[in-house]
Amino acid sequence: MAMLLPHPHPDFLKGLLKAPFRCYRFIFHSSTHLGSGIPCAQPFNLLGLHYAKWMLLSDGLKRNLCVQTTLKDHKEGLSDKGQRFVDKLFTGLIQGQRACLAEAKTLVESTHSRKKELAQVLLQKVLLFQREQEQPNKGNPLAFRLGLSGPPGAGKSTFIEYSGKLLTERGHKLSVLAVGPSSCNSGGSLLGDKTRMTEFSRDMNAYIRPSPTRGNLGGVPRTTNEVILLCEGAGYDIILIETVGVGQSEFAVADTVDILFYYCHQLEEMNCRVSKEVYLRWQHGSNNYVCWRLDCASSKDTGRVCDALKLLRRRLAVWRPKVVRISARSWRGGHWNVGYDARILGPNTCQRGAACQTTKATESLDVEPHSGKRVRAFQESPHSPGADSCSGTKGPPWGPGPRASSRFVVEGF
């Protein structure tokens, strides 16, 4: 999508000199067929800048791509103390130090403007490190993201308590992001999920961190994607995301995870409320499970939900949502064994899902009210290098993280 900036050449050149983090070298030709006598000007790639191609017209400038700064440019704005602080967190994070992971998570969730700059540099370094780790695996994601959603009291924390211990015994490293509700008036939160996991919280191969929603109505906080990136950089291969007790419209976690477990209460019949909840989870998540406790649901209930899911359009040719009855305490139902089915769909499916997760996270992290529309316009543009990011095997190329991508699109597009 091209954008025409109606500025005369002298005024525009003066503006370029004042723009931070952008260096240009203009090449002037002798021909004057464009009317102004200065037919074209091209930027050059200095210090690793991902540059855009420019063409000077008679009274304006045509822009085909956006300018994106790299990690080195962000580092230039940091002080020596801030740079040492970021390097310390990054070194401890990739070494698996839990204290550095907790401090990095606090930094990412901060709303202070200076701390946001430090967090952005840290996230870029973690993402570059993660991409290097994924190269031997042909670019496939190394971590498995699993979401747990459902109404209050459905058994989400019980599932994490018992299945988490089993997975750590098998040699996995788990990171649990337990989301708690926040007060709209005082801003306080009740983060009691970790205290109920008495045995699992003492496991050294598990990292449990409660997080408040901070007024976000999607069931998870807005910084969920950044926190997941930090946990993956720290070496955790399974990420469990427990949402708050949700109703019928909180489905933001489906855009973040690879597979979603939705837990239901006891049902005497398949009513309209559950039909709507199952439909919403199915429409907003590719790999879904609808789970009932064995002591609550009957085979008739599961059969009715299966019949309802058959009427919905399939989003993936290799996957259909499943309905299971499980028991975390007695380990009946094999819920974790069936959960691994989503991992064997193939590397292309995993990469495509990761690309779509990053794309949707970029849309949600808007810096100003209309930035989500700008992101969609950028994605639909034929000049966008990430136009086919959700259909191919590569992730979006415009930024190292959702928040940086959103800011990049707003400022440059």
From Swiss-Prot:
Top-level class of the enzyme under EC nomenclature: hydrolase
Entry's EC annotation: 3.6.-.-
Keywords attached to this entry: Chaperone, Cytoplasm, GTP-binding, Hydrolase, Mitochondrion, Nucleotide-binding, Transit peptide
Regulation: GTPase activity is stimulated by MMUT.
Keyword Cell membrane: no
Reactions the enzyme catalyzes: GTP + H2O = GDP + phosphate + H(+)
Pfam families: MeaB (PF03308)
UniProt GO molecular function: GTP binding; GTPase activity; identical protein binding; protein homodimerization activity
Region (Disordered): 362-406
Matching InterPro entries: GTPase_ArgK, P-loop_NTPase
SUPFAM superfamilies in the record: P-loop containing nucleoside triphosphate hydrolases
Main localization of the protein described in the UniProt heading: mitochondrion
Subcellular localization, as worded in the UniProt entry: Mitochondrion; Cytoplasm
GO terms for cellular component: cytoplasm; mitochondrion
Residues the entry annotates as binding GTP: 150-158, 327-329
Organelle transit peptide: 1-65
Job description of the protein: GTPase, binds and hydrolyzes GTP. Involved in intracellular vitamin B12 metabolism, mediates the transport of cobalamin (Cbl) into mitochondria for the final steps of adenosylcobalamin (AdoCbl) synthesis. Functions as a G-protein chaperone that assists AdoCbl cofactor delivery from MMAB to the methylmalonyl-CoA mutase (MMUT). Plays a dual role as both a protectase and a reactivase for MMUT. Protects MMUT from progressive inactivation by oxidation by decreasing the rate of the formation of the oxidized inactive cofactor hydroxocobalamin (OH2Cbl).
Record family assignment: Belongs to the SIMIBI class G3E GTPase family. ArgK/MeaB subfamily.
Oligomeric and partner information: Homodimer. Interacts with MMUT (the apoenzyme form); the interaction is GTP dependent.
PANTHER family (UniProt xref): METHYLMALONIC ACIDURIA TYPE A PROTEIN, MITOCHONDRIAL, METHYLMALONYL-COA MUTASE
Protein name, entry field: Methylmalonic aciduria type A homolog, mitochondrial
Source species: Oryctolagus cuniculus
Phylogenetic lineage: Eukaryota, Metazoa, Chordata, Craniata, Vertebrata
